C-alpha cells in the first residue's frame, strides 16, 4: 500500500506538478511531505498527515517550515 501511494505522488510530481507554477507555501513541498509522512508513519497515518497538510495549502495560510513529526515509539 505504501509503495502504491508513494508511486501516485511520484507520478504527480513527474507528470503534473512540473507543468504548473511553484505555488507551495511550505517547505518541504506538500508532495515531498506526503512521501516522507507515508515512509515514516505508514500508509494510513501518513496519508492522514499528507491530507491535513494539503488542506492548509491555501492563500489564507502563511505557510513556512512544516516538517513531518517524528514517529512515537
UniProtKB/Swiss-Prot annotation:
<protein>
    <recommendedName>
        <fullName>Putative membrane protein insertion efficiency factor</fullName>
    </recommendedName>
</protein>
<dbReference type="InterPro" id="IPR002696">
    <property type="entry name" value="Membr_insert_effic_factor_YidD"/>
</dbReference>
<keyword id="KW-0472">Membrane</keyword>
<comment type="function">
    <text>Could be involved in insertion of integral membrane proteins into the membrane.</text>
</comment>
<dbReference type="Pfam" id="PF01809">
    <property type="entry name" value="YidD"/>
</dbReference>
<comment type="similarity">
    <text>Belongs to the UPF0161 family.</text>
</comment>
<keyword id="KW-1003">Cell membrane</keyword>
<dbReference type="GO" id="GO:0005886">
    <property type="term" value="C:plasma membrane"/>
</dbReference>
Amino acid at each position: 500500500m505504501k509503495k502504491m501511494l508513494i508511486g501516485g505522488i511520484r507520478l504527480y510530481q513527474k507528470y503534473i506538478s512540473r507543468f504548473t507554477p511553484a505555488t507551495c507555501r511550505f517547505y518541504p513541498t506538500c508532495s515531498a511531505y506526503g512521501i516522507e509522512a507515508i515512509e515514516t508513519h505508514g500508509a494510513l497515518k501518513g496519508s492522514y498527515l499528507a491530507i491535513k497538510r494539503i488542506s492548509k495549502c491555501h492563500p489564507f495560510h502563511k505557510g513556512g517550515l512544516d516538517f513531518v513529526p517524528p514517529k512515537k515509539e
